């Protein structure tokens, strides 16, 4: 089984939705942790941290979803650059979805 563009787009969108839901669930826990280490303002304003966290989560969720649908490791590895391009080209929309939580 190999990736087709439509399958990859659907999996990417599912991975994005899963990531947004997970981010909403753990947001309060993250904020509590940041307050405990007394670097709340520094970490909240560190956009790179959040973007890296979100991109890493989308990629991880994509891999999990693809494995659940029995795609091979080779197929997944070949698709990841396209997933990264999808994420980068849609980062504004992704950040807006996260910010609206």
List PLM regions with ranges.
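Intrinsically disordered or highly flexible coil/loop and linker segments, enriched in small
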Residues: 21-32, 67-71, 96, 100
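Short terminal alpha-helical segments
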Residues: 1-36
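Generic alpha-helical structural element
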Residues: 1, 5-8, 43, 47, ...
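Short, surface-exposed loop/turn segments at secondary-structure junctions
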Residues: 39-48, 69-78
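Amphipathic alpha-helical binding modules
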Residues: 71-101
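Acidic, low-complexity, intrinsically disordered interaction modules
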Residues: 47-69
């Amino acid at each position: 089984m190999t990736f087709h563009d439509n399958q990859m787009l659907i999996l990417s969108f599912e991975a994005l939705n899963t990531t947004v839901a997970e981010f909403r669930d753990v947001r309060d826990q993250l904020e509590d942790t940041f307050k405990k280490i007394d670097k709340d303002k520094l970490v909240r304003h560190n956009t790179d941290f959040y973007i890296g966290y979100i991109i890493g989560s989308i990629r991880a969720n994509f891999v999990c979803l693809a494995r659940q649908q029995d795609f091979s490791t080779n197929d997944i590895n070949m698709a990841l650059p396209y997933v990264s391009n999808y994420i980068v080209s849609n980062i504004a929309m992704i950040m807006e979805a996260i910010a609206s939580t």
